[in-house]
Amino acid sequence: MFTIKEIERQARVKLLDTYEDNYRFKPTEIFDAMRDGLRMIRNVRPESKYVDGLLTGKMLVINGTESDFTVPESFPATIGGTTYTLDQFRAFTVNMEDRWMESLVYYVIHQMYMKDDTDTANAQLAQAYYTKFTESVRS
């Protein structure tokens, strides 16, 4: 399993969006794309719901407990009665085996480039990363 922070970091590196004081994409935008990507992977590959041979019901693990992937509008945020900072949210574990991580990164990048699709180059990049996503999920 891997953390939200790991996916965000890998996506930002490929998006050339690593200057923390001036991110082009807000963390919540990346988290929304991540949640949607997890849903896509689970729909296309139902076996992705299994971790170490056990069926998982929820997309995140928060403090050892499975949880839905709810993206707050801002931080600090209250989830399930507990308030979390942005860094604490980033430390949540994604309830999926590591082999799906690369596919999820591709999906996040695709979604971020879709936001900039008025730029022809970004529209092409969005399509290229969606193709990488679909190929990696289906292989």
Residue ranges and their predicted role:
Residues 1-139:
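Glycine-enriched, solvent-exposed interface loops adjoining structured elements
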